[in-house]
UniProtKB/Swiss-Prot annotation:
Pathway: Amino-acid biosynthesis; L-histidine biosynthesis; L-histidine from 5-phospho-alpha-D-ribose 1-diphosphate: step 7/9. NCBIfam families: hisC. This is Histidinol-phosphate aminotransferase. Belongs to the class-II pyridoxal-phosphate-dependent aminotransferase family. Histidinol-phosphate aminotransferase subfamily. Its EC number is 2.6.1.9. CDD domains: AAT_like. GO terms for biological process: L-histidine biosynthetic process. It is an enzyme of class 2 (transferase). It comes from Campylobacter curvus (strain 525.92). The keyword Transferase applies. The modification N6-(pyridoxal phosphate)lysine is found at residue 227. InterPro entries: Aminotrans_II_pyridoxalP_BS (IPR001917), Aminotransferase_I/II_large (IPR004839), HisP_aminotrans (IPR005861), HistidinolP_aminotransfase (IPR050106), PyrdxlP-dep_Trfase (IPR015424), PyrdxlP-dep_Trfase_major (IPR015421), PyrdxlP-dep_Trfase_small (IPR015422). The lineage of its organism: Bacteria, Pseudomonadati, Campylobacterota, Epsilonproteobacteria, Campylobacterales. Pfam families: Aminotran_1_2. Homodimer.
Length: 365
């Protein structure tokens, strides 16, 4: 059987290992496993949201309101934008897929950082687009502009991951806005701001204001409920852009693309600001501990504006350390698939991080 030729060079996205795998393979009880691989919220889900999901569970047989009116109203009020400027996705990565299907094709190219979220390339290759990456692993806007100017006739989509996953660095907001002014209005610029809450809390100069994006005709801001809001398992993301962009992307959206329970969870999550603040405060405090640990252990790391930190290694094998940690019930994210001798650690609660430090010390040479 012949398949779409664009699939030939594609590899599956490597997700963080689940707790169930560790239980099966190593016989460790689930309660003793610490998962710090997928940048989930270490406090879980807001208790208010859990109760809302329970209350709505009896309606699981019903399709959701496909207009997502209540959620869009809540997002619009929070960010100061209109409901027609918002699209809802099954995770923000679904909206990434919409963007590429809407703008990219085999005659066009997509521009991204040297090391960044893997799904940009996967979705781009699905539509047969060419990939351009910067020489630097981290975001360097001078390099972005250099490549853009050299291939203006090809590039149809540009991705900026702010802050960047899996490295953690983040550009200053002012330089991002200046960059956007240099890009032709027929090129769609996707600002993937899944970790924006963490960046903004740490340094206001790094936080993108989604309402500011509406000043640009060709830019879309992507946000998610998976990180700061603790709804990774609910799969809810959103995009904010000019109505002209949103209306085109909506043509690609299947009806009922998030569930009845996911919709209820997202609406309630926006109300619990105390839970989000608790999450951000813990992240900032515990991030400082990881940075101090890395300095003391002479581990290379990139200052992070996310809810994770990436440790890079020279002589030791990051994959070997990750595997050893896995056998002890601690799941980290080996970045071998990104061609890095590094692993990424989600910032956990204090007691979780204590165990990470203890086990890491046993593996460092």
């Amino acid at each position: 059987m012949k398949f779409n030729e664009n699939l030939a060079g594609l590899v599956n996205y490597e997700a963080g290992k689940p707790i169930e795998l560790v239980v099966r393979e190593f016989g460790i009880e689930a309660k003793d496993v610490i998962k710090l691989a997928s940048n989930e919220n270490p406090f879980g889900t807001s208790p208010h949201v859990v109760e809302a999901i329970k209350s709505a569970a009896s309606n699981a047989f019903l399709y959701p309101d496909d207009s997502y009116f209540e959620l869009k109203e809540a997002l619009g009020a929070k960010f100061g934008v209109g409901t027609k400027n918002i699209i809802i996705g099954s995770g923000s990565d679904q909206i990434i897929e919409f963007c590429l299907h809407a703008k990219a094709n085999p005659q066009s190219a997509v521009l991204m950082a040297g090391v960044t979220f893997a799904m940009y390339e996967i979705y781009a290759k699905q539509v047969g687009a060419k990939i351009y990456r910067t020489r630097s692993q981290e975001h360097d806007l001078a390099e972005f502009l250099e490549i853009y100017e050299a291939h203006k006739d090809e590039i149809s989509v540009i991705f900026l991951c702010l802050p960047n996953n899996p490295l953690g660095e983040c550009l200053d907001t002012k330089e991002v806005y200046e960059f956007l002014k240099r890009i032709d209005e027929d090129v769609l610029v996707v600002l993937d701001c899944a970790y924006n809450e963490f960046a903004k809390f740490k340094d206001a100069r790094k936080g993108i204001e989604s309402s500011e994006i509406l000043k640009f005709k060709n830019v879309i801001y992507l946000g998610t409920f998976s990180k700061a809001y603790g709804l990774g398992g609910m799969r809810v993301g959103y995009g904010i852009a000019k109505e002209s962009i949103i209306s085109e992307l909506c043509k690609l959206r299947a009806p009922f693309n998030i569930t009845t329970l996911s919709l209820k969870a997202a609406i309630e999550a926006l109300k619990d600001e105390e839970f989000v603040t608790k999450t951000l405060e813990n992240n900032l405090k515990q991030m400082a501990r990881y940075e101090a640990f890395a300095r003391e252990a002479d581990i290379e790391f990139i200052p992070s504006y996310t809810n994770f930190i990436t440790f890079k290694f020279d002589k030791q094998s990051a994959s070997e350390i990750s595997q050893n940690m896995l056998k002890k019930g601690i799941i980290l994210r080996d970045l071998k698939s990104y061609k890095l001798n590094a692993f990424r650690i989600t910032i956990g609660q204090s007691w979780q991080n204590d165990r990470v430090f203890e086990e890491l010390k046993q593996n460092l040479k």
